[in-house]
Design a protein with these regions (language model features):
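Transmembrane helix-boundary motif of multi-pass solute transporters/channels
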Residues: 23-61, 78-105
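Membrane-embedded alpha-helical modules
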Residues: 100-219, 324-326, 330-439
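Membrane-embedded helical hairpins/re-entrant loop segments and their flanking transmembrane helices
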Residues: 17-19, 43-82, 247-319, 444
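Short, non-helical or kinked segments that cap or interrupt transmembrane helices
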Residues: 55, 78-91, 132-141, 194-200, ...
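Hydrophobic, membrane-embedded alpha-helices of multi-pass small-molecule transporters
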Residues: 18-31, 35, 168-180, 197-198, ...
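Juxtamembrane interface elements at the cytosolic ends of transmembrane helices
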Residues: 4-5, 35-39, 43, 178-189, ...
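Hydrophobic, small-residue-rich membrane helices and short re-entrant helix-turn-helix hairpins
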Residues: 12, 189-201, 226-230, 235, ...
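Intrinsically disordered, low-complexity non-transmembrane regions of multi-pass membrane transporters
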Residues: 1-23, 218-233, 268-272, 282, ...
């Protein structure tokens, strides 16, 4: 029994700071591109100014850090899966947030994020039952549609950013293509940590090249202060609207189903299999992290699978590496100058990089759909209907123009339409199975199941 014990202690073993810090920093760098992409894209889509976007990025990094501490360090027996995981903005939430923001503004996004977080935290103990309604056929359809529908956002950035004077200028497209190329080259010729930060390298190299083309302005950095405490409700008192809350709650539940897969995978990697109890604490922490996100002007958080890849690479299994990463994120979030640096990334560079990122989201969804038994009653039809309905609303939103606005919001928001279609059709075709006592299927990210 001794060996089992040392394996278990690996997760909780404390390393000296000089070892923890570089590893923690690696985790921060691996999730950094994804973490700043969400506020940059949301800010761009909602036409916020550089100062507001700087604030969003700072709030995001700060809250990422707190959310990571809640999961990796945990709070007693209440919160946290206590595994080496890093929390960052969920990409699944990006397109619903843009829709809510365009229709109602930022404060309604935060209202919806807060309520959805509370709902998730409250539902944590019965999450095992809820998961039956979200099998791979549902989550895979939603995540595929999310990735596909976000490509239009990435394309707009690649062309110069919505509303930009030079929109569609060939040099914008060339810069986006160059950034994409850098990411592909790094992925082909490097291994390990360098490969894990390929997108970040693409963003940095792309921005350097753009600065020689006179496309980068550092005024936001010089104007930003060195220290600023993140202010709760900076953009105003949150507004609560039912349609926005329903949208956000569906997104949060599906992000939590994803997170469960990550927890189980990480548990397997660090040889500390997850108990039901630790999973409940993990889901509860996801909800509380999201509630904090809404209060601190940030976003819904979820455990990032990119970082799990690093765990496998670095062979260091202790959760204190992620605790260290969380502390680094909190410190970065208090330094607006650092957040302002990210706002200097020109739209085409961001577009080239997010094109790959969102493409990967779609592929993740497809990977989940690979697990679905296509010969079984209705599964093919469920996916076909969900993806078609989800993409249809995105491509031809005018179709819903005459509907009441709450219905319009949900149908126009592709991923939500896809998820609801898949949930309803799955209940229709497979209800016997869903309500039987069989084990629910939880998707475990591919690169992690080895």
């Amino acid at each position: 029994g001794k060996k089992m014990n040392t394996e278990n202690n690996q997760v909780d073993s404390k390393l000296p700071f000089r070892k923890l810090f570089p590893l923690g920093l690696q985790h921060v760098l691996a999730m950094y591109a994804g973490a700043i992409a969400v506020p940059l894209i949301l800010g761009g889509a909602l036409a916020l100014n550089a100062q507001q976007i700087t604030f969003l990025i700072a709030a995001d990094l700060f809250t990422c850090g707190i959310a990571t501490l809640l999961q990796a360090f945990g709070i007693g027996n209440l919160l946290g899966v206590k595994l080496p995981v890093i929390l960052a903005c969920s990409f699944i939430a990006v397109s619903p947030m843009i829709s809510i923001g365009k229709q109602y503004g930022l404060t309604t996004i935060y209202g919806a994020v807060i309520v959805a977080g509370i709902i998730l935290a409250v539902l944590a103990p019965v999450f095992g039952k809820i998961i039956r309604i979200f099998p791979p056929v549902v989550t895979g359809s939603l995540i595929t549609v999310v990735g596909l529908s976000l490509t239009s956002v990435a394309f707009n950035s690649a062309a110069g950013g919505t509303g930009s004077k030079s929109f569609g200028d060939p040099k914008n497209l060339a810069l986006a293509a160059f950034t994409l190329l850098i990411i592909l080259v790094v992925n082909k010729y490097f291994k390990g940590f360098i490969q894990a930060i390929a997108v970040l390298i693409g963003l940095i190299v792309g921005t350097i090249v753009a600065s020689f083309m006179g496309m980068v302005s550092f005024s936001a950095v010089s104007q930003a202060s060195w220290l600023h405490i993140v202010t709760p409700f900076y953009f105003g008192v949150p507004v609560f609207r039912v349609d926005a809350i329903i949208t956000m709650t569906i997104v949060s539940l599906i992000a939590a189903v994803e997170a469960l897969g990550v927890f189980i995978a990480v548990g397997n990697i660090v040889k500390k299999p997850t108990s039901t109890e630790s999973l409940v604490k993990g889901i509860r922490a996801e909800g509380i992290a999201q509630l904090l996100g809404g209060v601190l002007n940030s976003f819904p958080y979820t455990s990032f699978s990119q970082n799990v890849g690093l765990l496998v690479l670095s062979k260091v299994r202790t959760r204190f590496v992620c605790v260290c990463a969380g502390i680094i994120l909190i410190i970065l979030g208090l330094i607006p100058k650092f957040a302002a640096l990210a706002t200097t990334i020109p739209a085409p560079v961001l577009g080239g990089a997010t094109l790959v990122m969102f493409g990967m989201v779609a592929v993740t969804g497809m990977r989940i759909l690979f697990e679905v038994d296509m010969n079984k009653s209705g599964n093919l039809l469920i996916i076909a209907s969900a993806v078609a309905l989800g993409m249809g609303g995105k491509i031809a939103p005018a179709a819903f123009a005459l509907l009441p606005h709450y219905l319009k919001m949900i149908l126009e928001e592709g991923p939500i339409a896809a998820a609801l279609t898949a949930i309803i059709l799955n209940l229709f075709f497979n209800w016997k199975e869903i309500f039987s006592d069989s084990e629910p299927i939880i998707h475990i990210p591919d690169e992690l199941s080895s």
